[in-house]
Regions:
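Structural/interface elements that position substrates and couple domains in central-metabolism enzymes
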Residues: 1-435
């Protein structure tokens, strides 16, 4: 099948590459000619484990192409995926200017039946607005489908190739048939393909992400309570997660969630509810808890030191989660801002995200070439992202490099007995302090 993918950001590039991997002819569109040239020359523009191998293979074999011409991309294609940004406005609503702008353009250049697919995360009713925008200029047959993505950064290729489920929202059997054919190679093991109306599909994505964000904020509140009551959040987490009605995932406490999805989608669902005069109280609390949790280590730091002016801080992790270079809404960025405002000097390391942080924060931090390099002369260590390479460090080496053996762990990477054995002062989330 010939497919056009409009947008070469995270969702567009992963989707386009993975569709090409099963034999489809995919042409991706982006208005940025420099980006198109880089991609056409085999230079991948995002970090995602496993993606580059598929990207280069399909580019070489001619199944994956790039252009800045929408007309060229849709010529002869059966399906057009819209994988465009929907950034939050000042009021939290999703900005649909890019989605609706492309829909308007499609209406002016389409000449035959197409299935237009919203792959972006969009508010309920967007499919109707896309349909109206296309129909304003094109009077032929077409369908608009909502097909939300459920990709987790860091494992997105596996998520796409072996999805838990495929949600397809459409209003015609013809559209369902086209989408079923396209997704058939990915659901051979019986993963469910769920047919529903477009509005239900649109809400499904927001509801899923908002529920996961709710689990995180709930567990972070439990962690705060553990600190006040003398309980251990790791033990509580295991006890709660063993109930299969709840499950073990998304119950790890920390310094809050970030990324391109959870913050934006929770905001957008709150705004969508408000637009129909519904006050989504739970999600407002989820946002409030997360905003507070991003600063959860600061009171511990200030309680320990009193004043950190002139202190050198080693910071491990900048990306919002491991196995990605995505720094959108990353807790580490707020940590850098807060620490530097209090007069500290930050020495940071991340395996993938340093260039992205440097581009927006400049010289607010010193960027080091290894985790151990950050520790040279540091007064204390802050851990903001749970990269695998941080989990089993050489504690003896850390002791030699640091001025003071103090760790503030925002991701609970280390066992309490381990840091105690090595003589560290250790603060984590929802557990006893080691002093």
């Amino acid at each position: 099948m010939k497919i056009a993918v409009v947008g070469t950001g995270y969702v567009g590039l992963v989707s386009g590459t993975c569709f090409a991997e099963t034999g489809n002819d995919v042409i991706c569109v982006d208005i940025d000619q420099t980006k198109v040239d880089r991609l056409s020359n085999g230079q991948i523009t995002i970090f995602e484990p496993g993606l580059e191998v598929l990207f280069k293979r399909n580019l070489k074999e001619g199944r994956l192409k790039f252009t800045n011409s929408l007309e060229e991309a849709i010529d002869g294609c059966a399906v057009i995926f819209l994988a465009l940004p929907t950034p939050p406005g000042e009021d939290g609503s999703a900005d649909l200017r890019y989605v609706l702008g492309v829909a308007d353009h499609l209406g002016k250049i389409m000449t035959d039946y197409k299935v237009i697919v919203d792959k972006s995360t969009v508010p309920v009713g967007t499919a109707d607005r896309v349909r109206d925008a296309v129909a304003a200029n094109y009077k032929g047959d077409f369908d608009v489908v909502s097909n939300p993505e459920f990709l987790r950064e860091g494992v997105a290729v596996d998520d796409f190739m072996k999805p838990d489920r495929v949600v397809i929202g459409a209003e015609s059997q013809r559209a369902f048939d086209v989408m079923d054919e396209l997704y058939a190679p990915y659901v051979r093991q019986g993963n469910p393909v769920m047919h529903m109306d477009t509005r239900s599909a649109e809400l499904t994505k927001y509801a899923a992400n908002s529920f996961l964000a709710t689990k995180i904020s709930f567990m972070n509140e439990i962690a705060r309570l553990c600190e006040l009551l003398g309980a251990d959040v790791d033990m509580v987490r295991k006890g709660v997660g063993s109930d299969d009605r709840i499950g073990k995932r998304f119950l790890f406490p920390g310094i809050g969630y970030g990324g391109s999805c959870f913050p934006k989608d929770v905001q957008a669902l709150v705004h969508s509810a408000a637009s129909v005069d519904y006050d989504f109280k739970i999600l407002k609390a989820v946002e409030e808890v997360n905003a507070e949790q991003k600063k959860a280590l600061l009171p511990k730091i200030m309680q320990h030191y009193g004043n950190i002016e002139g202190k050198i801080v080693a910071l491990w992790g900048l990306a919002f989660k491991p196995n990605t270079d995505d720094i959108r809404e990353a807790p580490a960025l707020e940590m850098i801002e807060a620490l530097t405002e209090l007069g500290a000097k930050v020495r940071a390391y991340d395996p993938e995200a340093m260039a992205n942080v440097k581009a927006i924060m400049g010289d607010k931090a010193t960027f080091c070439d290894s985790s151990y390099h950050t520790l040279e002369g540091a007064d204390f260590l802050v851990i903001a992202t749970e990269w695998p390479e941080f989990r089993t460090p050489d504690f003896s080496k850390i002791q030699l490099l640091m001025k003071d053996k103090v760790i503030f762990d925002g991701r609970n990477l280390f066992e309490l007995d381990t840091v105690k054995k090595h003589g560290f002062t250790y603060y984590s989330i929802g557990r006893s302090d080691i002093k």
